Amino acid sequence: DIDGLEWYAGFIEMQDESNWKKFRKQVEMHGKTIPMMCCSPDFTHPDPSFRLNEITKQKKWIFMTSTLGGTYCRVLSGQRRPGLSVEEGVSFAADCIYKCLPYAKEQGITLILEKHYKDDFWVYPEFAQKMDVFCKLLDKVNDEHFGVNYDPSNAFLAGEDPLELLYKISARVVTMHASDRYLKEGTIEDLRKEEVGATGYAKRLAHGEIGKGLNNYDAIFTELKKVGFNGWISIEDGVDGLEQLERSVSFLRKKIKQYWPEH
């Protein structure tokens, strides 16, 4: 039993704009909404014309989100290309986000920055994968239509503590990806060796049932409750079948009731 669906801008059917309102109607007929859009702009390319094209794509995704009835649209920093300095990357990404914000406001959309691992179609890992870089970028963009989509599992993939990250950014978290990850084989260090040179996620990486992995959801929800979080929590699970997804939903429902009894 869920309340909504997070949408993915890359669904093949979304290439036809006439489908957008149809999908919204179908979802709403089931008593649900589409609050969040998942998309992956690449704002760190050194070529200004490339970045301008990514801004244009992001604006289309913002309009897509609005048409579907959503209020949150993801942004990423971009790829961590060789030779790109932290200062350059932060500047490129912040500038692109700022150029998207007026249109986001016009459409009633909040842009949500995620500390990601690596988009499926990227060669290089996320530029702002590391906590210090992510926080530098976050500090550069201050706007009421901009916040954080917190995914605790991505911190593990950067060799970092998701709670340490949360304590630094909790006041700016507006949405969350609830997930649990595990390595099918090897170690985090083995994973890092595979970050560059292979498009998409390393094969040793897998999603797990929520509540069964490394994430401490009691600590996470305690902090989010403390800072007044009241946003959407999107479930990242289901790759191993609907039964596992149902167990993840049940786990999160119980935790939400525990920490937000008013819901």
Predicted feature locations:
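Histidine-acidic metal/acid-base catalytic patches
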Residues: 1, 131-263
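Conserved, mostly hydrophobic/aromatic
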Residues: 5, 27, 54, 65, ...
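Catalytic-core regions built around general acid/base machinery
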Residues: 19-30, 99-104, 165, 219-223
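Active-site acidic/histidine proton-transfer and metal-coordination neighborhood
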Residues: 28-30, 48-147, 157, 168, ...
